[in-house]
């Protein structure tokens, strides 16, 4: 009923959050999607415990079954106490580096036709492939946020949509301008990131 109310009110997408004590966002979103026709689901995911190869297939499956009603919001984590509830002892900057590697892997898995091998700092796998591709092209949109230097730099390198808090417009304009400069430094087109 909650998701139906959002759809009837004209929302295009709703956030399904993530905490160390919340219900599984994919299961919640899939249940809600079965009871709506158009509403999209921005599913929050925190890298660290689910392999990017598994999440890539899981998200692509959801994307196909709902004909493109998914986006992912990659969250690097809250405070250390929240992280440790799930057994994650990486420090703040390391968590952001892990998120950057995770997002790159997702995009590689979703856009390459050949098997993918990766030997990175946080993840290692050989010849990963999926027989299930994304419905959306070129891939499922990846949202990302954060205000620290680590977050801004990782987001500039990897995300499709940079999420901001609701703040005064003049502050948001400054943040957007700064973020676009960071995107340009990475060699990406700032207009390609929303």
Segments the model singles out, each with a brief description of its role:
Residues 6, 10, 32, 62, ...:
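Conserved, mostly hydrophobic/aromatic
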Residues 1-36, 40, 133, 137-140:
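N-terminal beta1-alpha1-beta2 module of alpha/beta enzyme domains
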Residues 14-16, 40-45, 70-74, 142-145, ...:
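Hydrophobic faces of well-ordered beta-strands that scaffold small-molecule active sites
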Residues 25-46, 98-105, 185-186, 190:
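Alpha-helix-loop-beta-strand connector modules within alpha/beta enzyme cores
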Residues 22-29, 168-183:
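Active-site-adjacent beta->alpha loops and helix N-cap segments on the catalytic face
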Residues 10, 35-39, 66, 156-162:
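Glycine-enriched alpha-helix->loop->beta-strand junction motifs that scaffold or abut catalytic
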Residues 1-5, 55-58, 144-154:
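Short, acidic/polar
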Residues 1, 49-117, 165-177:
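Flexible, glycine-rich active-site loops centered on histidine and acidic residues
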């Amino acid at each position: 009923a909650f998701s139906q109310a959002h759809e009837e009110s004209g929302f295009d997408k709703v956030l399904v959050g993530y905490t160390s004590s919340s219900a599984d966002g994919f299961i919640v979103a899939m249940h809600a999607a079965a009871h709506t026709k158009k509403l999209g689901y921005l599913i929050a995911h925190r890298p660290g415990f689910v392999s990017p190869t598994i999440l890539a297939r899981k998200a692509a499956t959801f994307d196909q079954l709902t004909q493109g009603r998914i986006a992912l919001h990659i969250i690097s984590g809250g405070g250390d106490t929240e992280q440790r509830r799930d057994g994650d002892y990486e420090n703040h900057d390391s968590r952001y580096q892990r998120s950057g590697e995770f997002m790159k892997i997702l995009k590689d898995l979703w856009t390459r036709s050949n098997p993918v091998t990766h030997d990175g700092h946080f993840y290692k796998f050989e010849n990963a492939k999926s027989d299930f591709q994304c419905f959306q092209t070129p891939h499922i949109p990846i949202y990302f946020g954060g205000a620290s230097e680590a977050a801004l730099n990782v987001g500039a390198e990897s995300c499709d949509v940079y999420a901001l808090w609701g703040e005064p417009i003049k502050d948001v304009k400054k943040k957007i301008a700064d973020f676009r400069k960071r995107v340009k430094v990475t060699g990406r087109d700032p207009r390609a990131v929303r």
